[in-house]
């Protein structure tokens, strides 16, 4: 939920609010602490969210995991999940890099648990208890799609029958916020107030954090938020045998957003290639008429002026 930054949780040193001046962030619901639901033992925030998110996915599946295990071999499970930027809070790489500078020392867990692919490894080893394939492809905002493509290919090749695809990110740290601020991609308080003035909105209450990110309209930047999401893929025969509720089919995955362009952080022609390939594949599957009348496009929606033209 996008709201004013909770200082005690995310900005104890005052870097984000006092130095950068960015008070809006997408935070977990107030009072919700995923580490209180299991023995977290100094787990980074994104890993805590992984455990909760994967547990929720299994619960929503509605089929006991032991029943699924009876139908497949232990190595027919695959997990593709992770973070795009890294786990940079004090229990991950943040603690690893800051400890000596703050007069302490790193723990034995900072390096290992801070790795971007730890989400997949943790799910495979500790939640599912499987010995199948794990992996993670980092691709900025398209990270989930890259992992989805690997999951699709694993099922199509026959190397896996049950695949978990997901991601977990907890980017509300001073270093990550500062990085997006330096790229002029962040909706900070100064830009928010300027935008509110242009839109003739009330300025007496200060920045309107809930409206900081405004995709597809007059906007000044994005808002960083923490999130965890997982989907479960199965081959057709396994889904039918288990009586699983089927929400959809992944017929194609394309991601060419990092194609030829003038700036690595800006949009490029790859966005159009991605869209064209997916639309062409959809037309093959459902036909031109249904493509035009029965489809839905979920646009990226970063809320940055540079991306507004392609989104």
Predicted regions located by residue number:
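Active-site-proximal gating segment of KS-fold condensing enzymes and close homologs
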Residues: 5-19, 45, 83-136, 176-177, ...
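Active-site-proximal alpha-helical scaffold in enzymes
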Residues: 50-63, 116, 120, 134-169, ...
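Short glycine-aspartate micro-motif
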Residues: 78, 161-165, 247, 296
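Condensing-enzyme catalytic core mediating Claisen C-C bond formation in acyl metabolism
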Residues: 192-296
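Glycine-centered flexible beta-alpha turn that most often forms the glycine-rich phosphate-binding loop
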Residues: 300
């Amino acid at each position: 939920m996008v709201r004013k930054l909770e200082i005690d949780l995310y900005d104890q040193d005052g870097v984000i609010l006092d130095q950068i001046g960015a008070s809006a962030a997408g935070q977990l619901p107030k009072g919700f602490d995923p580490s209180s639901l299991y023995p977290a033992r100094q787990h980074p925030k994104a890993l805590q969210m992984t455990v909760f998110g994967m547990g929720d996915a299994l619960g929503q599946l509605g089929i006991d995991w032991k029943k699924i295990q009876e139908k497949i071999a232990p190595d027919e499970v695959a997990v593709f999940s992770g973070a795009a930027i890294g786990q940079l809070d004090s229990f991950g790489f943040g603690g690893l890099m800051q400890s000596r500078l703050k007069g302490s020392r790193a723990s034995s867990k900072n390096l290992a648990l801070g790795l971007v692919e730890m989400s997949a490894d943790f799910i495979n080893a500790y939640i599912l208890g499987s010995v199948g394939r794990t992996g993670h492809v980092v691709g900025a905002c398209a990270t989930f799609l890259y992992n989805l493509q690997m999951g699709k290919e694993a099922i199509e090749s026959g190397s896996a029958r049950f695949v978990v695809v997901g991601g977990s990110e907890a980017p509300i740290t001073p270093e990550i916020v500062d990085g997006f601020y330096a790229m002029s991609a962040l909706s900070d308080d100064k830009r928010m107030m300027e935008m509110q003035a242009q839109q003739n909105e009330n300025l007496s209450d200060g920045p309107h954090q809930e409206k900081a990110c405004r995709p597809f309209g007059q906007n000044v930047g994005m808002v960083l938020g923490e999130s965890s999401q997982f989907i479960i893929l199965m081959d057709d025969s396994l889904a039918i045998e288990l009586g699983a509720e089927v929400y959809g089919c992944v017929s194609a995955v394309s991601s060419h957003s990092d194609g030829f362009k003038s700036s690595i952080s800006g949009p490029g022609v790859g966005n159009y290639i991605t869209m064209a390939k997916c639309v062409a594949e959809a037309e093959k599957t459902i036909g031109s008429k249904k493509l035009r009348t029965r489809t839905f496009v979920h646009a990226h929606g970063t809320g940055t002026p540079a991306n507004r033209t392609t989104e």
